[in-house]
Amino acid sequence: GNDPKVRLAMANASLMAGVAFSNSMVGVVHGLGHATGAVAHIPHGLAMSIFLPHGLKYNLKKRKDLIGQLLLPLAGEDFYLNTPKEERAQKTIEKAIEMKKAMNDACGLPGTLKEAKVDYDQLENIANTALGDGTLLVNPEALEFSDAMKLLDDAYENY
């Protein structure tokens, strides 16, 4: 947009994301995102936004406690402390989806692969391409073709 305050806020958010990103390993979200960009030509950041909730769900079994810790910065101290520990990871995912929907609505961005005009017939090619992406080596949960297809199918219609 043309609002300088909004542009500065986005630049600062991008900087903070870059600092955080440079000290972490990526996984299924980036693997699917790289493949979707290569096959369907959607922007990388948009792909990351679409796949983030699905990647969190996929890694929930092996990273439940870590995902649950994200609830504190996403929802605030009161909500975090009043949420039972065993529910925090699921609440984190719900909060991430809620925030994603608000951002997409505010910015007019698509929230699903279908809204991003990805052709459903491209999903198999995206899944096969993703399986060759090196980012999957560091994902906590191994990704098979059937898993990739489930994630892509879910991301096609759902936030």
Question: Residue locations for each model-derived region?
Answer:
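Mobile late-domain/C-terminal helix-loop "cap" segments
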Residues: P53-Y159
